[in-house]
UniProtKB/Swiss-Prot annotation:
Subcellular location, principal: membrane
Record-given protein name: Tumor necrosis factor receptor superfamily member 19L
Subcellular locations according to the entry: Cell membrane; Cytoplasm; Cytoplasm, Perinuclear region
Top-level taxonomic group: Eukaryota
List of residues that carry Phosphothreonine: 230
Position of the signal peptide: 1-31
Region annotation (Disordered) ranges: 123-163, 324-343, 379-420
TNFR-Cys repeat start and end residues: 57-97
Tissue expression notes: Expressed in the teeth.
Membrane topology classification: Single-pass type I membrane protein
Protein family per UniProt: Belongs to the RELT family.
Organism, as annotated: Mus musculus
Length: 436
């Protein structure tokens, strides 16, 4: 052989050796199949195959429904779509959703479509007309076993309560304004009645009892206080009438105006101890125009004369103890009248306001013909009145009756047979005569 042939053989032998030396530093690779392995339904590939197992069971809450090499998928949550669970999920089956929850509506047969609230539903929606009577689809398959022998978990039977009670809300919204309007209307009517003079009260007025109607006693004459005296009852009965109160106010105003005129045009008078009594004149320090005792001097007229009708009357004993001496103011233009009627003989003045005078007559037993007389006469006579001229030779009682003049009417009370009489009172007001 030639030398060239030997060189070619030597080159062919060195080529595999050089390739071997090049591949020796690389790590040895394990043989792998061309396609990955597949796991059965209910299992997923094991990420750690060191235990000798290539697949593992799906964890709770997940499932795998076919042969594949993917991990298990979580179960579907029906509550997110406001639906009820018709069948609970297993390792090989997903959760099956049923009808919509109470208060929600949605298309039937499409479990993965979310439900809508009934407040947005049309009037003829089938799911919202029934209140609380909503069936659950797939309840019959909630129990038992599956086709492959695995036990089925019972479905969730709870229902979401309806948060919207539209009927009750509408009723409350309608009732509250009605009550408010009724209250405002009642207040308005009460104010209108008060302006017209009526009295609005929330309590029922107690009327006369059925049994007390036949007593024949006028309720106006029934005293509220058992200790109230006769003068108090008389004054209360007079002042209860609006007409009498207005008349007394007019008399007081007229009396005050006359006093102001007299004091403004006349000098300070000088007191005469022997003159008869004039009820219009106020001696200031010793008068009983009011029932509070002696009054202090305040200007031309005492402060007690400026007051209106008193509230409490003076007792007859105090009035008798503090009766002032009669006085008279002389005037240059007009002489004092001789016909001015002083108090009757034996009378004790109780109250004197203007021309209104209340006096007390003590009991008199000297005469058997007349026991007592009650009259209402004028406190101050007119210009044309004549002085009293009682006839001589008559008893004192008849003189008292005849002393008032012929123009006034007298009523005589026949004597009571063997009956003790109590103190009587005389009320004199203006120019009218009246017997009580």
């Amino acid at each position: 052989m030639s030398l060239q042939g030997l060189m070619m053989k030597r080159t062919l032998l060195c080529w595999p050796l050089s390739c071997l030396f090049v591949l020796l530093p690389w790590p040895l690779a394990t043989p792998t199949p061309i396609t990955p392995w597949l796991c059965p339904p209910g299992k997923e590939p094991d990420p750690d195959p060191g235990q000798g197992t290539l697949c593992r069971t799906c964890p709770p809450g997940t499932f795998s429904a076919s042969w594949n090499s993917y991990p298990c998928q979580p179960h579907y949550r029906c509550s997110l779509q406001k639906r009820l669970e018709a069948q609970a999920g297993t390792a090989t089956h997903d959760t099956m959703c049923g009808d919509c929850q109470h208060g929600w509506f949605g298309p039937q047969g499409v479990p993965h479509v979310p439900c809508q609230p009934c407040s947005k539903a049309p009037p003829s929606t089938g799911g919202c007309d029934e209140s609380g009577r909503r069936g659950r689809r797939g309840v019959e398959v909630a129990a038992g076993t599956s086709s492959n022998g695995e036990p089925r978990q019972p479905g969730n039977g709870t229902r979401a309560g309806g948060p919207e009670e539209t009927a009750a809300q509408y009723a409350v919204i309608a009732i509250v304004p009605v009550f408010c309007l009724m209250g405002l209307l009642g207040i308005l009517v009460c104010n209108l009645l008060k302006r017209k003079g009526y009295h609005c009260t929330a309590q029922k007025e107690v009327g006369p009892s059925p049994g007390g109607g036949g007593s024949g006693i006028n309720p106006a004459y029934r005293t509220e206080d058992a200790n109230e005296d006769t003068i108090g009852v008389l004054v209360r009965l007079i002042t209860e009438k609006k007409e009498n109160a207005a008349a007394l106010e007019e008399l007081l105003k007229e009396y005050h105006s006359k006093q102001l005129v007299q004091t403004s045009h006349r000098p300070v008078p000088r007191l005469l101890p022997a003159s008869p009594s004039i009820p219009h004149i106020c001696p200031h320090h010793h008068h009983l125009h009011t029932v509070q005792g002696l009054a202090s001097l305040s200007g031309p007229c005492c402060s007690r004369c400026s007051q209106k009708w008193p509230e409490v009357l003076l007792s007859p004993e105090a009035a008798a103890a503090t009766t002032p001496a009669p006085t008279l103011l002389p005037t240059a233009s007009r002489a004092p009248k001789a016909s001015a009627k002083p108090g009757r003989q034996g009378e004790i003045t109780i109250l004197s306001v203007g021309r209104f005078r209340v006096a007390r007559i003590p009991e008199q037993r000297t005469s058997s013909l007349l026991s007592e007389v009650k009259t209402i006469t004028e406190a101050g006579p007119s210009e044309g009145d004549l002085p009293d001229s009682p006839q001589p030779g008559l008893p004192p009682e008849q003189r008292a009756l005849l002393g008032s003049g012929g123009s006034h009417t007298k009523w005589l009370k026949p004597p009571a047979e063997n009956k003790a009489e109590e103190n009587r009172y005389v009320v004199r007001l203006s120019e009218s005569n009246l017997v009580i």
